Amino acid sequence: MSQLSFSSFDTSLMVRDAQGRYLLATADQILEAARQAIEHKMRRGASFSSPATVKEYLRAKLAGFEHEVFAVLFLDTRHRLIEYAEMFRGTIDSASVYPRELVKEALRLNAAAVIVSHNHPSGNPEPSAADRALTQRLREALALVDVRTLDHVIVAGSSTTSFAERGLI
């Protein structure tokens, strides 16, 4: 396999415009293409069988936002995707999350498990004390209706932090 230099890699990322001409792809076009590819791969019913798959999917979904977004993967008993939902939006450094709304949606979808996630636009993937407290509140609320909280993933640009991998959940 031949190696590509950065400059040759740049020129290989092309898009076709409305007139059929090939132009260099912008960063936004590349990110959108990556999101679409991952979305296509993880359609409803796809199984989240590894933490790497979960993190790749959530990174593609949440990395580009300039404000906090709290999202949930609702899963069935075999950890297959029922629905991805961006449930709450906030400011550049916080988002209000309401456990009651998350429980209602889990029940509506008949979810057996969830993976919660949010982004840190600051670029720092470390969980705050508020993130840890929220995770515990959500786990307790969801447990009352027999819905398991499998993980809480923080996305910060290309970095992610998994509560499950750190033993925090």
Residue ranges and their predicted role:
Residues 25-87:
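Long amphipathic N-terminal alpha/beta scaffold segment
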Residues 2-32, 36, 53-56, 78, ...:
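Active-site-proximal loop/helix of nucleotide/amide-processing enzymes and allied scaffolds
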